[in-house]
């Protein structure tokens, strides 16, 4: 049997798809091919993600290729995957999670506190912008789009004093070797995006294919990301609004951190809970409902009007 993986053409997307292809080849001794596509999010690089809006910026074209029967599966950064899938497609697996926290890359400053007043910080994310300004209102947060290599190039050209990336991508592409300093944020400093660090394998709804993809599943990643995705789905928040949610398994307990608010950090809702591992089902939804009772929907609407 031959499997075809639909993938974006960015360096990180290709790494992720090759990684999954290798596991499938080794486990099942089958042929696995990659088919590259450009998504809307890859093409529209002049505008901040939040302004482009819409769900599935990095997934829609890959999903369409599967629905046209040109591919059997697609490998996504799970944080880019909307909560609901087109008919005929399913979330087949969530693979073992890489580190889920964010990090600061810089040529001149070894950590976040050493950044000078007014330092220029590059990031695509309103979630990061909101939390960075909470920690350091004196910073200048500037929108930064493009692939990872072009972002690092801009940093080296001194367009920015620092840029913020997900630690998972830094590790997968060995980006720490390309810059002088990498400062890892704790999850209390910067709450990550839902499902950050996890790969989501989306596939056609076919029994044989789903059986082959079972080997990619990781139970811990499934538990953590199900809480996070449930929280986002209940709030109806896409990746363009400032929401952070992270569930971290610690033995038989789970630490859940959540934050949302306005991009400038002037108004936020934030919480941190410890729950029993066995109580994870439905917790994301119930936490989101508590946030809604405190005015989360109104706050997110206000955030959208500021974008």
From Swiss-Prot:
What else does UniProt say about it?
A: The porphobilinogen subunits are added to the dipyrromethane group.
Q: Which CDD domains match?
A: PBP2_EcHMBS_like (cd13646)
Q: Which UniProt keywords apply?
A: Porphyrin biosynthesis, Transferase
Q: Which GO terms describe its molecular function?
A: hydroxymethylbilane synthase activity
> What cofactor is this protein dependent on?
dipyrromethane
Asked if the keyword Transferase belongs to this entry, the reply reads: yes
Its quaternary organisation is: Monomer.
Cofactor: record remark:
Binds 1 dipyrromethane group covalently.
What cellular component GO annotations does this protein have?
cytoplasm
Q: What is this protein called?
A: Porphobilinogen deaminase
Q: Which organism is it from?
A: Campylobacter jejuni subsp. jejuni serotype O:23/36 (strain 81-176)
- Spell out which residues are annotated as carrying S-(dipyrrolylmethanemethyl)cysteine: 239
What metabolic or biological pathway is this protein involved in?
Porphyrin-containing compound metabolism; protoporphyrin-IX biosynthesis; coproporphyrinogen-III from 5-aminolevulinate: step 2/4
Q: Which superkingdom? A: Bacteria
Tell me the Gene Ontology biological-process terms attached to this UniProt entry: protoporphyrinogen IX biosynthetic process
What are its E.C. numbers?
A: 2.5.1.61
According to UniProt, the reaction catalysed is: 4 porphobilinogen + H2O = hydroxymethylbilane + 4 NH4(+)
**Pfam families tied to this protein:** Porphobil_deam, Porphobil_deamC
What InterPro entries does UniProt report for this protein, alphabetically? HemC, Porphobilin_deaminase_cofac_BS, Porphobilin_deaminase_N, Porphobilinogen_deaminase_C, Porphobilinogen_deaminase_C_sf
């Amino acid at each position: 049997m031959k499997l075809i993986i639909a993938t974006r053409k960015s360096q990180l997307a290709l790494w992720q798809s090759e990684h999954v292809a290798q596991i499938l080849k080794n486990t099942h001794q089958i042929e696995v091919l990659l088919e590259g596509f450009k998504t809307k999010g890859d093409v529209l690089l002049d505008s901040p993600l939040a302004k482009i809006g819409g769900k599935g910026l990095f997934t829609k074209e890959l999903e369409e290729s599967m629905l046209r029967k040109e591919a059997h599966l697609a490998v996504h950064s799970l944080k880019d995957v909307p909560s609901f899938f087109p008919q005929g497609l399913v979330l087949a697996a969530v693979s073992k999670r890489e580190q889920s926290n964010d990090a600061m890359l810089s040529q001149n400053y070894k950590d976040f506190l050493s950044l000078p007043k007014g330092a220029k910080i590059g990031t695509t994310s309103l979630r990061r912008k909101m939390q960075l300004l909470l920690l350091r209102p004196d910073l200048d947060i500037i929108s930064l789009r493009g692939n990872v290599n072009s972002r690092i190039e801009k940093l080296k050209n001194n367009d920015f004093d620092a840029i913020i990336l997900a630690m998972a991508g830094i590790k997968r592409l060995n980006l720490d070797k390309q810059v002088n300093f990498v400062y890892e944020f704790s999850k209390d400093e910067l709450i990550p995006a839902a499902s950050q660090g996890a790969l989501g394998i989306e596939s056609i709804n076919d029994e044989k294919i789903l059986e082959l993809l079972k080997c990619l599943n990781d139970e811990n990643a499934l538990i953590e990301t199900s809480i996070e995705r449930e929280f986002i789905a209940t709030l109806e928040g896409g990746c363009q609004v400032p929401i952070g949610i992270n569930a971290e398994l610690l033995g038989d307990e789970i630490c859940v951190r959540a934050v949302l608010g306005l991009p400038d950090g002037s108004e936020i809702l934030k919480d941190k809970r410890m729950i029993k591992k066995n109580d994870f089902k439905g917790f994301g939804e119930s936490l989101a409902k508590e946030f809604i009772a405190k005015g989360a929907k109104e706050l997110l609407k206000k955030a959208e009007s500021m974008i």
